[in-house]
């Protein structure tokens, strides 16, 4: 049996130069694995709480307390447990913390242990991680939702929409989808240069030009798709992460310099659908605006994927409430929002059972850890969001998916346009 023998932890840096937690787990059979925990820039108020040190060190963002929690309390509690019983291990972590938001021991310390245990168990079983988590039928490669133009909290510009993504829905394989996305990314750089706009990069590797409006950004990306030799909406589609929490205050959305209601924002998004091949819109409204979300879903949810991130925070309880209220039709999956692998898998299972799509996601503060690539294939999400095809912490996930596709061989299937059943390309 793969019994947990040792648990270690350390403070490392993420892609934004901020500290994060790395956990190492050793099993009695000699197996060893490590996992690093990501961190977000725009976070939902209902997420699992990160344990940070405060004070002057690292501007208060140190994680020595979280590391100590692993070494002094969490590690001793899981040593002796069977690593291949993930639910048992994760329940022990949740019970040990004893709070609904993991604020006592920290979601970052708990998640690090949860993921490291899963990795160690897969190594002990001599199985690839995607196969260990997903079982013998895991074979779907996700559409890479590439954030090639950054705004909002990911860039120091006046663009309110946080992420403008390209989705290579027409590609025949993941490897070709990655190539298509990379070629559009490089074409966008040339388009921006020609327009006299900045080609500086945001947190997630996308360009961060200070463009005048959402439609101006979409026009630039559409030009880049065509310049790369592809057809917008047929080969490569568009997707948005509005991250509306960032421009909502006091019941109003201040968007592109104008105060707007939820109904007016819905009208704006509906207008985009009539003009651009948008397959997915994430967090179009404020996380606690349940009524606005329900109305928006009823209005445009039959034409586009509406993804709940901050509104659901990968939490099965909030997702269940959203399903009951008719809110969104897809779930964004971030392992550090809920804090354990088991709870993440439970949220995905609930979404799929309820007819919701899922999109596995990175955070803006990432590491070289590639577990979300394996997770996307394991659960058959058909979609992954892990930044631009640039910056090694983003590319690491794409490269892992290339390895998985190669390992699967003829059994590999690329999700492509089947991942977005609500979208119909303009026949023109």
From Swiss-Prot:
Active site: 204 (proton donor), 334 (proton acceptor)
GO BP term, pick one: glycolytic process
Superkingdom of source: Bacteria
GO molecular function, one term: phosphopyruvate hydratase activity
Cofactor needs: Mg(2+)
Free-text comment on the cofactor: Binds a second Mg(2+) ion via substrate during catalysis.
The protein, known as: Enolase
